[in-house]
Amino acid sequence: MTAIEPQNLEKHTPMMRQYLTLKAQHPDMLLFYRMGDFYELFYEDAKLASELLGISLTARGKSGGDPIPMAGLPYHAVEGYLAKLVQLRVSVAICEQIGDPATSKGPVERKVVRIVTPGTLTDEALLQERQDNLLAALYQGKSGYGYATLDIASGRFVITELANTEALEAELQRTNPAELLYSEDFSQMSLIAGMNGTRRRPEWEFDFDTCQRLLLNQFGTKDLNGFGIEGARLSLQAAGCLMQYVKDTQRTALPHINSIVRFNQTDSIVLDAATRRNLELTVNLQGGHTNTLASVLDSTVTAMGSRMLQRWLHQPLRDHQVIKARQSSIAELIATENYQLLAEDLKALGDVERITARIALRNARPRDFARLRQALGLLPQLQQTLKASSEPHLQYLSQVIGEFPEELALLSRAVVDNPPMLIRDGGVIRDGYDAELDEWRVLSAGATDYLTQLEAREKEQTGISTLKVGYNRVHGYYIEVSRRESDLVPLSYQRRQTLKNTERYIIAELKEHEEKVLSSQGKALALEKQLWEELFDLILPKLHELQEFATAAAELDVLCNFAECAETLNYACPELSDASGIHVEAGRHPVVEQVSQSPFIANPVTLNSQRKMLIVTGPNMGGKSTYMRQIALITLMAHIGCYVPAEHAVIGPVDRIFTRIGASDDLASGRSTFMVEMTETANILHNATPNSLVLMDEIGRGTSTYDGLSLAWSAAEYLANNLNAMTLFATHYFELTQLPEQIKNVENVHLDAVEHGDSIVFMHAVQEGPASRSYGLQVAALAGVPNSVICAAKQKLHHLESRDHALEQSKNGEMAVQQTISFPTQPTSPVIEALEKLNPDELTPRQALDYLYNLKKMAR
């Protein structure tokens, strides 16, 4: 997308000189150059646009002696093309004709009036309705990183200081910016190499004094201490660069960006990049949005509520007071059943958050004002429902939402009921709003009566039966007569146009009327556009209150949504404790239970000061990973204020959640699966604390058995002895089940299965103690591995077991390295085998019923 250097411009045509000059000012963007009813692209821009948009690439004569590659698209279809380019993270500078072709000497004057970049979108047609669209800036200093994000479609401006690359990677994944600005001397390019929408900025744009001055001017303050961001030097440098970029691209005032918030990592539970990925909070492992936690929890009725819910999921809170306020609100909404009534009102509010931003940027469209009017009209009814609640947090939200009777009255007077999409052709301002506009409209509309009278009079005076008065945009008003009666036309008629069967004429009186009508229409449209601009000025003083109303309404939407989830999905309110630990009775995986075809087997977990680590064993496909993930998700849900899928839950303080579950090659960085696994493990061992929840699944698989077992043993030992973190450690290394004998506060649990012949039934119920077998060969058979391979594997297994048994005896019972798996030569009844393993005292009534159904299935 680089521009041709504007050297030797005199060899080009005047129009191309104009184009090349404008292109040189926007070298890293596509330049849409307006020519009549088309936007044209030239040279490399044309080639790239042709490739990306599938439009024809042609040539437009020559300039400077060379053919000019050219591609064009109609101006009325530009939004659709912009949407495609935005999805590809391509920026566009839109150049319009601002001069009058009739009076211009040489090329019509043009200038860039709009810049569209992936991170600065506000147009409804270009934005994902239920996702934040963030512009971010990143600055690297000696002590760490400064990071700033801005959602220009809402005005939300956030900064944070990050100590290391792990924290930066997690923040980049959490925020997922549409566009990222970074300094020329940024050294950790591997962190952002795979991201789209990255944009390199000169070092001087991050100068601290310049950035601070920019922010002070934006907020209209003498210092930044009132925002609680003192000492955040690196992130202020990032914020200043971001602010300059927004000013350069928007080219208008930004009144909705009126504050800045510092996000401290200590305010929320820290989730690293691997944890966000493995827990599939908003994006699944395949990159889609189905079967995620958000897909289960999100029944919000507004887009702004949905976006807030996703932010909550990625930032679970540590402040128990805020969480309890949310819980109390949900309980009240359930008890009164008001969540259903409120949801109906909220559904009609629309996306007030983004509408107010467009009003602030003065690029709102007529229908935005109509939607805002509708939203304001619903507030009395919404407030009536909220007033029935005595819950303090709901009362607070009611107060912030407020009512706007003056703005509602203004919009009701000013804007028609069903306005057109654009102000361009008028028809937006309601009759009766402005007396002068009404006068011009009456004069313009009165033309119809006058023309009818003129036509009747001329017919009578001339005796021409075919005479009629008409109008078109090219020739204006005319009198039309058939060719066979044209000899009856008076001398005062001046011929204007000859057609095949008719002649068209003009008379002085009609010409005078035409000038008056066209003048009145033009003046009416000009005045209407002026009144339209004044409407922005009348609404903007209430901008801050409208933004607060939108934020409070979004939160109310999320809380009503949580109330509905609790009722329809049988969730319970978790108890928040100051004592370290996690206790869950009959917990369920919130996503798996919704997509599973069979009843979900609920399971408990207890982690406390006497029981800090659970060694989880059991067969492949037995449910170990699901069990561990559900504990993490229940913990996370509790810390956003949501009820949880369990009969009862008590959750203590949690500062971090780590997951080391599954891995794949990182080809872009040249890291093997094992290297990725060890990197994630190292991050956990360096950063976990006694209040961290750690999920470790199959550590050490990617290397030799001895290496893998040694690493898994040492990692588990370090977590238990040195870090004392709350840990679930799943493994197929059966030797690890001996850890509870050597380390206090470590216990064994397992998920079992029952084998009958060549079939296997997974019980999915967590029981105390270690598993007896892994059933790897049976799972391989279920997966479709050829029978000959399974048979050969059984023979090899028997050989290895015999060898290990002999070795074990020769070493007087020393721990064997290979996991011992035996197959009974004479299989007993699966029902008897299952009953022998059953401990009825450990089962809940629901688990007992599920167990009974499984026994009946095995007995068939």
UniProtKB/Swiss-Prot annotation:
Pfam families: MutS_I, MutS_II, MutS_III, MutS_IV, MutS_V
Ranges in coiled-coil conformation: none
GO cellular component: cytosol
GO biological process, one term: mismatch repair
Family annotation (Gene3D superfamilies): 1.10.1420.10, 6.10.140.430, DNA repair protein MutS, domain I, MutS, connector domain, P-loop containing nucleotide triphosphate hydrolases
Keyword field: ATP-binding, DNA damage, DNA repair, DNA-binding, Nucleotide-binding
Binding site for ATP: G618, P619, N620, M621, G622, G623, K624, S625
Any GO MF annotation of the entry: ATP binding
PANTHER family in the record: DNA MISMATCH REPAIR PROTEIN MSH1, MITOCHONDRIAL, DNA MISMATCH REPAIR PROTEIN MUTS FAMILY MEMBER
UniProt function note: This protein is involved in the repair of mismatches in DNA. It is possible that it carries out the mismatch recognition step. This protein has a weak ATPase activity.
Family membership: Belongs to the DNA mismatch repair MutS family.
Protein name stated in the entry: DNA mismatch repair protein MutS
